[in-house]
């Protein structure tokens, strides 16, 4: 009897909450991607790789999808010498420029790279600083045909975990409030919260920039003397929101780390 060929088992199918697959996890070219028009041969393969401009720029690490859409709408992006529009399709043969500078784009099924970095105090989370302070991006390894995008930021005097990725799509998925990704901080205060202050910070909320803000969770972690530790959780982060919430109830933050 002739031996039957060995079959490789299929990988299990991923199940996403609500059946909604995020953009960064969808196939990007290759098997499973939508085929473009153009018939057989090289021309058909080339057409099949054409994708929306803002999506390709985001997955290539040139910013989050929302920021890139703003840049395109404001006329900062050109494709083959013409000002781009939202929804334009591009392929590997197109020349895309951002503010007049040719940028590299990544097509295909390559997965995004992700990097964890413990930010010490005394570093900023932007690429350029008028005061020439140290930046976290100077410490990251170089990547070819892409660049690192920071998933959130920490204050200059705050230490803790930062996540970087080469995919703007993934960064947007983790940062956008509608996905409700939790951010946890360990905060050291000068003083102890009263039950009324805890209720204000977790239920009633404090107005910041015309909007009610509150912690999703607040846990007392104890302490000694006037120094007291709390762990707080937010599902979206405004500029210095943790510090401003505690200042609103009269307590000064003297230390914080992103958990």
Regions inferred by a protein language model and the residue ranges of each:
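Basic, flexible Lys/Arg- and Gly-enriched helix-loop patches that mediate nucleic-acid binding at interfaces
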Residues: 19, 26, 34-256
